[in-house]
């Protein structure tokens, strides 16, 4: 019997295979009930080019598990990725539905200039 987490991990693994075939940098997102995390990872998968999360001092003071926090993380990851020389990425939702906080983070990253 599959648990909810095992099903999500299986979906994520399947999507990552397609992203790896593209050979693009990937913007990966992880969410927990309390926090949001985002990383831009190199095509080979061995190097993190930029990262942002609600655990950082700048974002920790406000609410960390809602859409407002997700929007701030999306904006921050886009500015850090552009500073690292990354302009386009493949969006890796890590098996989460493209809805709610994941969607808000992606939209904020697009508005801040990241292409995907």
Curated annotation (Swiss-Prot):
**GO biological process entries:** translation
Domain of life (superkingdom)? Bacteria
Cite the InterPro entries for this sequence: Ribosomal_uL18_bac-type, Ribosomal_uL18_bac/euk
Q: GO cellular-component terms in the record?
A: cytosolic large ribosomal subunit
Q: Write one Gene Ontology MF term.
A: 5S rRNA binding
**Is the Ribonucleoprotein keyword given for this protein?**
yes
Looking up SUPFAM superfamilies in the UniProt record yields: Translational machinery components
Keyword RNA-binding listed: yes
CDD domains named among the record's database cross-references: Ribosomal_L18_L5e
Keywords carried by this UniProt record: Ribonucleoprotein, Ribosomal protein, RNA-binding, rRNA-binding
User: Entry's Gene3D superfamilies?
Assistant: 3.30.420.100
Q: Which HAMAP family match?
A: Ribosomal_uL18_B
Q: Which family does it belong to?
A: Belongs to the universal ribosomal protein uL18 family.
Q: How does it assemble?
A: Part of the 50S ribosomal subunit; part of the 5S rRNA/L5/L18/L25 subcomplex. Contacts the 5S and 23S rRNAs.
Q: What does this protein do?
A: This is one of the proteins that bind and probably mediate the attachment of the 5S RNA into the large ribosomal subunit, where it forms part of the central protuberance.
Name of the protein: Large ribosomal subunit protein uL18
Source gene? rplR
């Amino acid at each position: 019997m599959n648990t909810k987490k095992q099903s999500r991990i299986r979906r994520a693994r399947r999507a990552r295979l397609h992203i790896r075939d593209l050979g693009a940098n990937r913007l990966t997102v992880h969410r927990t009930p309390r926090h949001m995390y985002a990383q831009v990872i190199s095509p080979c998968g061995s190097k993190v080019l930029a990262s942002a999360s609600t655990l950082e001092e700048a974002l920790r003071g406000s609410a960390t598990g809602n859409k407002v926090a997700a929007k701030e993380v999306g904006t921050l990851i886009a500015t850090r990725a552009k500073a690292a020389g990354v302009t386009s990425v493949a969006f890796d939702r890590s098996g989460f539905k493209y809805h709610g906080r994941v969607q808000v983070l992606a939209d904020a990253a697009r508005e801040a200039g990241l292409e995907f």
